Structures are given as C-alpha cells and as structure tokens.
Amino acid sequence: HPAQSSSQLKVHSHSLGSSDIGWYGSPHWWEVAHAGFPASLQHVPLLLPTTHSVVRSQLDRWLAHKGLRPQLVAEIEDSALLETFGSTDLGVFPAALVAEKELLKRSQVRLIGACEGVQEHYYAISTERKVMHPLVQRILKQT
C-alpha cells in the first residue's frame, strides 16, 4: 500500500510499478514441489511474510482459493532474510518475479511456480508532491 500521511508528516506515494509473485525453493524443495505445483505446496514447509504484509494477505487468499493448507514453518518480516532461510533448505518462499534473475544469481534457489494474481507493489515515498531529486525523477519517468 502507498504510505499514509499523518497530521505531523505529509507524505506522497509515487508508484514505481508492480511484480507478480513466484514460489522459490532450494534444489531439494524444487524437486519435491515443481511437478505437482500448486497442490504440492501442501506437502512442503512454507516460509511466509508476516501478517502485517499486504502480500501475505494476498498469499493467504491464494492458498485458500487453491484449497491448500500448507505447513507454515516461519513468518519472516524481512524479504532478504526470507530468501536466506529459503536458500538453506528451510522451506519454500514467495518472492517477486521481477527480481528472479538477481535472486537466482545470489542464491541456489529455483522457481517452483508463479502465484497468479498476487502482486507486490513498489512506491517511492517523498515529503513533497513534486519529487525534486534528479535520480528519483529519472526513476519515476521510467515507470
């Protein structure tokens, strides 16, 4: 979600875009889960973002819609930590497909399958409606 202004601080959200989410796992969990995806997620340990996350509520709805009751082994707030635990055989985890190339380069994980309909949204947050910083202006123009 975009940032919310408060009475003490006025902030503005500038959309940078969004990305579909995929399920990733170590080579071991890829072997177990790839062929029968998404039903196979019920038979592997899952690492999920905490319930504070917008993506988590989307993931919960997606899993319920698929009729899956997976084994949740950890709820992790930080996406980098989620990736770290997922790359060490602790379980399967969700991550943005837009970052797949970098994720595969950094970690020994594989894409198990896409989580259709679940998206991560990205925003630049500023204290002014008009962004003044030249680099941020360039990023916003490219979106």
List the model feature ranges, each with a label.
Residues 30-33, 44-66, 132-140:
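Secondary-structure junction motif
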Residues 11-22, 105-119:
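Short beta-strand->loop
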Residues 1-44, 98-99:
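Acidic, Gly/Pro-rich loop/turn segments at junctions of secondary structure
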Residues 48-49, 75, 93, 125:
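Active-site-adjacent beta-strand anchor residues
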Residues 54-110:
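Hydrophobic hinge/microswitch elements
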